[in-house]
């Protein structure tokens, strides 16, 4: 077939295709007009995207404002409604003067317990410096960083951890390092002055990180942010992080075996622990985890119990960067769950984490600990005893 005939045939096919498309569009248009009755374009009565009604609870309301700052569409809508000016003076992180605005915008502020007043007044402050640092802790790229939340008076707990599951090691090019995370314990919180003892402990063991903020239960989420900042600057190459309390027993060997079994894909955004779903704030004022309705409303995202959890160093860096987009919350494990949710991640439940302990009948059976990663809670001497038994060459389970 000549080139000319091929071109004529191709043009014929294209013309037929155009006629077919035109026919389909006309049929579709006719059908739409019949359904509309008048053949007019239907215009929605309301805006497709509009700013939702602000929540009544203070934390939710402030978080909504923060969401608008970091969402380009919501930010644009905020500018259009003239609300940007009202947000500009209250949106800064690291603002460490008391935010007296909360005294008038939080319903019943004066009737709240003092711990809530302090938390709300200084909600935006994260600008705390290190008083004790370990800048060379991660000089050798750690495989596992053990980060343990502690308080200054807990000398016995820290020493028990050093002698048991928190031992630093460098076996098979897999370095395990340890840091304890502390804030200040001032006399007004009924703590004795233990600064000299802590200084001696830090100089001897080189494993204390201490910031100049008030170390209280409600400031544990602040401790989380400050620790993640330290990781990002002083330990960015650690492959994995275990973060837990100083009253837990951890089977470090089992954790290392588990981590070595992971694929690169699984390890990248690893976050495992004793995960809690569909939980919400407690409203009983007598409970440790009480949160008033005026502070927070709604359910919590999935979160791992704060006794301890395990995650990748890669995710630690991602978590730090996302903390700017999530206001501090009085409960640190919930706060971490909020940050994970912001990243579009869900923590994974692992049966080896027992933050609510094991059955009473199994507590004295050493074989019950072989396949566990964490048990909460254990006293210092119990940590040492369990660890010693697990290391026995005569152990048979």
Curated annotation (Swiss-Prot):
Q: What is its EC number?
A: 2.4.1.149
Paired cysteines (S-S):
none
Please state the pathway this protein functions in, per its UniProt record.
Protein modification; protein glycosylation
Classification via InterPro entries: Glyco_trans_31
Membrane-spanning residues where? 8-28
Residues carrying covalently attached carbohydrate according to the record: 79, 89, 127, 173, 219
Q: How does it sit in the membrane?
A: Single-pass type II membrane protein
Question: What general EC class does the enzyme of this chain belong to?
Answer: transferase
Q: What keywords is this UniProt entry annotated with? A: Glycoprotein, Glycosyltransferase, Golgi apparatus, Manganese, Membrane, Signal-anchor, Transferase, Transmembrane, Transmembrane helix
Tissue specificity note: Ubiquitous.
Q: Does the keyword Transmembrane helix apply?
A: yes
Q: Name one GO cellular component term.
A: Golgi membrane
| Residue intervals on the Lumenal side | 29-397
Tell me the compartments it is located in: Golgi apparatus membrane
Q: Which GO terms describe its biological process?
A: axon guidance; cellular response to leukemia inhibitory factor; keratan sulfate proteoglycan biosynthetic process; O-glycan processing; poly-N-acetyllactosamine biosynthetic process; protein O-linked glycosylation; sensory perception of smell
Cytoplasmic compartment segments: 1-7
Q: Which cofactor does it need?
A: Mn(2+)
Looking at the keywords, is Glycosyltransferase present?
A: yes
Official protein name in the record: N-acetyllactosaminide beta-1,3-N-acetylglucosaminyltransferase 2
What organism does this protein naturally occur in? Answer: Homo sapiens
**In the UniProt record, what gene is named as encoding this protein?**
B3GNT2
């Amino acid at each position: 077939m000549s080139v000319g005939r091929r071109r004529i045939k191709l043009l014929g096919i294209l013309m037929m295709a155009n006629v077919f498309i035109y026919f389909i569009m006309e049929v579709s248009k006719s059908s739409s007009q019949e359904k509309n009755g008048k053949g007019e374009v239907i215009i929605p009565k309301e805006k497709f995207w509009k700013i939702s009604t602000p929540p009544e609870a203070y934390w939710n309301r402030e978080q909504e404002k923060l969401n608008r700052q970091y969402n380009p569409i919501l930010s644009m809508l905020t500018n259009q409604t003239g609300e940007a000016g009202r947000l500009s003076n209250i949106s800064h992180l690291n603002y460490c003067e008391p935010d007296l605005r909360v005294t008038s915008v939080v319903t019943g502020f004066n009737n709240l317990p003092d711990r809530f007043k302090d938390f709300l007044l200084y909600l935006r402050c994260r600008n705390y410096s290190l008083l004790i640092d370990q800048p060379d802790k991660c000089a050798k790229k750690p495989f596992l960083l053990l980060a343990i939340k502690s308080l200054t008076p807990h000398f016995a707990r820290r020493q028990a951890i050093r002698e048991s599951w928190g031992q630093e090691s460098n076996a098979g090019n897999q370095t395990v390092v340890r840091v304890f995370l502390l804030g200040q314990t001032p006399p007004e919180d009924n703590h004795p002055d233990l600064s000299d003892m802590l200084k001696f402990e830090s100089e001897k063991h080189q494993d204390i990180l201490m910031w100049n903020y008030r170390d209280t239960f409600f400031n544990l989420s602040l401790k989380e942010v400050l620790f993640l900042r330290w990781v990002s600057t002083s330990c960015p190459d650690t492959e994995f992080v275990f973060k837990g309390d100083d009253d837990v027993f951890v089977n470090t060997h089992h954790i290392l075996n588990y981590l070595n079994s992971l694929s690169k894909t699984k390890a990248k955004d690893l976050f495992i622990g004793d995960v809690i779903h569909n939980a919400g704030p407690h409203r009983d004022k007598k409970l440790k985890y009480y949160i008033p309705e005026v502070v927070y409303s709604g359910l919590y995202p999935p979160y791992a119990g704060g006794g301890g959890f395990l995650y990748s160093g890669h995710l630690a860096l991602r978590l730090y960067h996302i903390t700017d987009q999530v206001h501090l919350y009085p409960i640190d494990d919930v706060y971490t769950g909020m940050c994970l949710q912001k990243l579009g991640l869900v923590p994974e439940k692992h049966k080896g984490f027992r933050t609510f302990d094991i059955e009473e009948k199994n507590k004295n059976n050493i074989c019950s600990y072989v396949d566990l990663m964490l048990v909460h809670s254990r006293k210092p001497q119990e940590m040492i005893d369990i660890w010693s038994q697990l290391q026995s060459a005569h152990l048979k389970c």
